[in-house]
Design a protein with these regions (language model features):
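Active-site beta-alpha connecting loops in nucleotide-dependent enzymes
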Residues: 38-41, 319, 351-418, 429
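Generic hydrophobic/aromatic pocket-lining and core-packing "Φ" positions
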Residues: 47, 117, 158, 214, ...
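P-loop/Walker A phosphate-binding loop and immediately adjacent motor/lid segment at beta-alpha junctions
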Residues: 49, 53-54, 59, 72, ...
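N-terminal leader/targeting and accessory segments in enzymes
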Residues: 1-85, 89, 234, 256-264, ...
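Active-site regions of enzymes building and remodeling cell-envelope glycoconjugates
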Residues: 7, 69-77, 142-145, 244-251
Length: 433
């Protein structure tokens, strides 16, 4: 109870709890039910069913009018935050027993944490990974369902990492997770800010709210942690305005603690100068130059030898689904990229344009937008595809609960009149490919 600083406690607290649960359907006798207010439902509406199923305690913002004699009621100001702190305490604060580093930003999170996992594994550590694509304990895969898991699952996963000998863990920290307090109660050794661009306005409402959500991550760091920010993104300084942590910077175009310069960008990789040392990397594009700088800076701030870090980084390949190249027998090249924001799509297409040979091969872009997500970026992404491509095919991504035709109609609004004859709309993604 001290971990959540309750406003009011009613009933006996001298009992051993079963599990911490926020879904009333999963409550068993002896469990603690935390009533969280969500975007789709309010957990307070399910307090009665939770008590009927034998909950030993209810944690909530508004106390119910009545409760069984054997059910303890705990009132808090923020149930979501309390859930995170309770989960951390329940699993004996696993994040304090390893070096946990998180990355937040619009683009680059998955590439950064995945390559950090590979880097530290090659450095000889057992490492945990929490990402959009997958979760890993060492090399053992744990299925991933969200960019950042719920607070209970997250602490359970970190506890499992500790039990299996992990010394480090790297995780993606989404804006949704921060606003929903999924990381409350966690102790971070460090935090990375990659960049911030147009995304998730369907959830946050405004771009300012999106920025504030990301900033929460750095506001919560303690004085022993480090904050590593992309200095070329003007909002990097905003992220660390109120942080107690030690701030370091990386950049390609500004003075920074970890300064990089792209010397050559080819279909085979990047030649870079980082803090005075020239290195060849297998990754492609300026956007990956930023990712590499963030990874390098993080490793050095975690105490690793700079030269050894650069040597290993030069041996690592790109992450699956991030600028993946497939070359057919006839010489046609396909590039697969996760790009799902206007800025990410622009970065990928500009990189492809810069890599075109003297023959100026045609760029055919197949792009779609997800359903039940920020609709304002749909015409923008279509316009970017037209600007940097010779031909464009608008197609389905994951429509979720929307009609694909409605999504494609939104995208079509961004097609310039002089590009209309270069654009096809094919809803079936397989057919488009």
């Amino acid at each position: 109870l001290p971990a959540i600083n309750p406003v009011k406690v009613q009933g006996d607290t001298s009992f051993v709890i079963g599990q911490i649960v926020f879904d009333s359907r999963k409550v068993a006798a002896g469990d603690v039910f935390v009533a969280v207010r969500g975007t789709q439902a309010d957990g307070h509406a399910f307090i009665a069913p939770a008590m009927e199923r034998g909950a030993a305690a209810i944690v909530c913002e508004t106390l119910p009018e009545a409760a069984p004699d054997n059910c303890c009621l705990v009132q808090v100001t923020n149930s979501a935050e309390a859930l995170g702190k309770l989960a951390a305490a329940y699993y004996d604060y696993p994040s304090q027993k390893l070096k946990l580093t998180g990355i937040t930003g619009t683009n680059g999170k998955t590439t950064t944490v995945t390559l950090l996992h590979q880097l530290f594994t090659r450095l000889g550590y057992k490492v945990g990974l929490i990402s959009t694509i997958r979760n890993l304990i060492g090399e053992k895969e744990i299925p991933a369902t969200h960019t950042t898991p719920d607070a209970v699952s997250l602490n359970a996963l970190l506890a499992q990492m500790v039990a299996e000998g992990c010394t480090h863990a790297f995780m993606e920290v989404s804006s949704h997770a921060l606003v929903q307090y999924r990381t409350a109660g966690l102790n971070f050794a460090g935090a990375i800010f990659s960049n911030i661009t147009h995304d998730h306005l369907d959830y946050h409402g405004t771009f300012d709210a999106y920025i504030r959500a990301k900033k929460m991550f750095f506001d919560g760091l303690d004085k022993n942690a480090f904050a590593l920010i992309n200095k070329d993104d003007k909002r990097g300084a905003v992220m660390v305005q109120n942080t107690a942590s030690k701030v370091s910077t990386f950049a390609l175009h500004s003075p920074a603690d970890f300064k990089g310069k792209v010397l050559a960008n080819t279909v085979r990789g990047l030649q870079m100068e980082i803090n005075g040392k020239q290195v060849w990397f297998r990754l492609i594009g300026d956007f990956n130059a930023y990712n590499l700088l963030g990874i390098y800076g993080t490793a050095v701030l975690l105490g690793e030898d700079a030269e050894q870090v650069l040597t290993i980084l030069s041996q690592l390949d790109s992450v699956q689904g991030r600028f993946d190249r497939i070359v057919a027998a006839n010489g046609t090249t396909a590039i697969i990229d996760y790009a799902h924001t206007p800025d990410a799509l622009k970065n990928v297409l500009q990189t492809i344009q810069s890599l075109r040979g003297q023959r100026k091969e045609s760029i055919i872009t197949i792009v779609g937008c997800g359903g039940n997500r920020d609709a304002t970026k749909r015409p923008v992404m279509a316009a970017i595809a037209c600007q940097f491509s010779d031909r464009v095919m608008l197609t389905s991504d994951n429509p979720r609960f929307e009609k694909p035709e409605a999504i494609l109609a939104d995208m079509k609004k961004g097609v310039p009149a002089d590009a209309a004859d270069r654009v096809q709309i094919i809803a079936d993604r397989r057919q488009a490919i």
